[in-house]
From Swiss-Prot:
Keywords: Membrane, Mitochondrion, Mitochondrion inner membrane, Phosphoprotein, Repeat, Symport, Transmembrane, Transmembrane helix, Transport. It holds the Pfam family Mito_carr. The chain crosses the membrane at residues 17-37, 66-86, 111-131, 190-210, 230-250, 293-313. This is Mitochondrial glutamate carrier 2. Its main location: mitochondrion. It comes from Rattus norvegicus (Rat). It is found in: Mitochondrion inner membrane.
């Protein structure tokens, strides 16, 4: 009996990991261009290169082609599987562990489970976003460089070689250089800011989703439909994403290694927040909020839909 239960538990955990991984891959593929626009909008300082999300996507497509809108996607697609798998599986595991009765709603325990999931995921999230941001922002830096060169043709703030570096950065090269010069801590630059963003996000998202999803649970099946889970994931994701946008802006600014001419560098979260407030005003903390909502809503809607359909369970049954 014990062996049988252990086998079933192992199967359940594996299925949850597969569900989280598949959901992450599908979600990232669908919304990555909007995420790229969010990163570029959040990193703008002084004169804006892009007026908004649509303007950013149009200019990116014209200057860098369709594939330019997926710059950095390879990093995300590689690492989003373990990231989303850890996040969703950790929350599910902690909820079952902390809840006294599986059918009883307990907001405090749900928030604590969400907090635990947010902490677990940063092991993957921090280095993934560190590399992704450098690749996503390269196109904006190239535009800034060209504008500076046009304005001051006799004075070149960047060397000719740096142009190609901005346009053709490599995730492998960036990772190797960070490890060589700064060690493992280089890949975990902005870890504190990542925790400050992801823990509140998870505390808001998971309890909100669980309660919204519960509204659509069928008495016959004991589960919500795919459509309801998708809508609940979208709603909870968009609310959570907008709520933590100021922290996401700080994280993006801190993790960006290369800056344009005249752009600030930051020593940490407090220094970044102070400079952002004094030099760009309160509105700067909400840069990319619309993009974040458009990215996170379908990303988590798809994630929860796939998760509750149970694709992982069906895949594992094929190997039984």
């Amino acid at each position: 009996m014990i062996a049988c239960r252990m086998s079933s538990q192992d199967l359940s955990i594996t299925a949850k990991l597969i569900n989280g991984g598949i959901a992450g891959l599908v979600g990232v593929t669908c919304v990555f261009p909007i995420d790229l626009a969010k990163t570029r909008l959040q990193n703008q300082q002084g004169k804006d290169v892009y007026k908004g999300m649509t303007d950013c996507l149009v200019k990116t497509a014209r200057a860098e082609g369709f594939l330019g809108m997926y710059r950095g996607a390879a990093v995300n697609l590689t690492l989003v599987t373990p990231e989303k798998a850890i996040k969703l599986a950790a929350n599910d595991f902690l909820r079952q562990l902390l809840m006294q009765d599986g059918t009883q709603r307990n907001l405090k325990m749900e928030m604590l489970a969400g907090c635990g999931a947010g902490i677990c995921q940063v092991v993957i999230t921090c280095p993934m976003e560190m590399l992704k941001i450098q690749l996503q922002d390269a196109g904006r830096l190239a535009v800034c460089q060209q504008a500076s060169a046009s304005a001051t043709p006799t004075s070149r703030p960047y060397s000719t070689g740096s142009t190609s570096t901005h346009r053709r950065p490599s995730a492998t090269l960036i990772a190797w250089e960070l490890l060589r010069t700064q060690g493992l801590s280089g890949l975990y630059r902005g870890l504190g800011a990542t925790l400050l963003r992801d823990i509140p996000f998870s505390i808001i998202y998971f309890p909100l989703f669980a309660n919204l999803n519960q509204l659509g649970v069928s008495e016959l099946t004991g589960k919500a439909s795919f459509t309801h889970s998708f809508v609940a994931g979208c709603a909870a994701g968009s609310v959570s994403a907008v709520a933590v946008t100021p922290l996401d802006v700080l994280k993006t600014r801190i993790q960006t290694l290369k800056k344009g001419l005249g752009e600030d560098t930051y020593r940490g979260v407090t220094d970044c927040a102070r400079k952002l407030w004094t030099q760009e005003g309160a509105a700067a903390f909400m840069k990319g909020a619309g993009c974040r909502a458009l990215v996170i809503a379908p990303l988590f809607g798809i994630a929860q839909g796939v998760y509750f359909i149970g694709i992982g369970e069906r895949i594992l049954k094929c190997f039984e």
